[in-house]
Amino acid sequence: MILEFLSQGPALLVKGRRNVLVVADLHLGIESDLDRHGIHFRSRTRERCERLETCIRETLPDLLLLLGDLKHAIPFPSRQEQREIPEFIAHLRSLVPLGIVPGNHDVAIEQFFEPGELLAKEGVIIDGTGYVHGHMYPDVSLAGMLIIAGHHHPMVSLRDEVGCSLRSPAYLFSLLNDGCIGFPVREGG
C-alpha cells in the first residue's frame, strides 16, 4: 500500500488493490452557521466540488471515501445544506463510486445517499486499511491495522523572523501504543 497526499484537496490517495481517495471534514454549509453569528461568507461548496473533481480526475480512484463531517449543521441539515448537498453528491457520484463514514456533524445525512454508500460510523475496513471519522472509539475489528481518521483538523503554523506566518493543513502519523487511547501496536494482528 502507498499513501499519496494531495495538497490540492487536501486529500489522501490510498493505493492498494483498490485506489481509495479519502477526504474528511468538508463541513459543507458552514457559511450559513457563520452567517447566523454575524460572519458573512458566500458558499464555497462549488469550489470544494471543483477541487475534489480535480483530485478525482488526476488520481482516477476506484472509490471516493468521505471520512465524516460532510455537512456542518447539527442536528438537522440547514437550508443551505438541503439545497447544495444533493447536487454536490450527484456530481461526485457521476465521476466515481462513493461512500461515507458518518462523522459527528452528519446527523440525518442518510437522506443524501443511496443504499450501500452509507458506511458504519464505527469504521470500515477496505483492503486491510481501517477508516474512521475519529469522533468515537474505532470498532475492535480495526485493531492492529493502519487507521486513517479525520475529525481533528490538524494544522501547521510556520512563523518567520519578521513575524509573517503561514498556516496549512497537516497530516499526522503515529504508531498506537499503550500510552495512546486506542489499540496497542502489536495487538490484533
Please place each PLM-identified region on the residue numbering.
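Conserved catalytic scaffold of divalent metal-dependent phosphoesterases
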Residues: 16, 23, 28-29, 54-59, ...
